[in-house]
């Protein structure tokens, strides 16, 4: 087994290589053994330190999945149940098809309803593939301002891209928005408040939040993109996903 020093040396070398090869512009890594930290590495300058905050974006889905599984463990949701058990409108979802002019039409009825398990595993077909992306593009901005409004829209205006459970296709927004909304309904709490109470506070994670303070914003790590071969910092104003459902703020 490598020593703690060898592990840190390997991580530092990997970070230096990625920086030199322009594969990344900075990062932070920590290794724990038996629940105890054995090394930490930071590369990319002063803005990548032990107190830097990182935007999670769709990595928020990990917390959403954990929240649903905890609710299942507590007997408050059934992941094998149809989504319509919590949001009745989802009983009437149809499989859709794209028309030649880029619109979406109902094509057929699915053989069964989608379940929470389908949403967790990206096998529901909701908000997936080209059809799902198109429906999200067509979704009025006013319907994206809260989980409640977004979930209602998904249940009444969206279509499935394929038969539930027949295959997997990533759902960037809709699937996990619906799961987060179900968590709100069964707990009577906002999704962010539930995660804080169930995970962030008990685990001592004060910097994991849906609503960063000005002090926390000041510690955000930079985001960059390559423009004509050079790294250029992207200046996000406030919350990156402001105006989208709470799952992604």
Regions found by a protein language model. Name each.
Residues 1-2, 167:
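Short, low-complexity N-terminal intrinsically disordered segments enriched in polar/charged residues
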Residues 93-249:
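Short, surface-exposed loop or secondary-structure junction motifs
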Residues 50, 84-88, 121, 196:
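Phosphate-coordinating loops and pocket residues in cytosolic domains that bind phosphorylated ligands
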Residues 3, 7, 11, 56, ...:
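Hydrophobic (often cysteine-bearing) scaffold residues that line and stabilize catalytic clefts
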Residues 26-28, 82, 167, 209:
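Residues at or immediately flanking beta-strands
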Residues 2-57, 76-78, 95-99:
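Short, conserved catalytic-motif segment at the N-terminal edge
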Residues 26, 78-82, 190-194:
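Alpha-helix N-cap and coil->helix boundary residues
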Residues 11-16, 29, 35, 55-86, ...:
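Active-site SXXK
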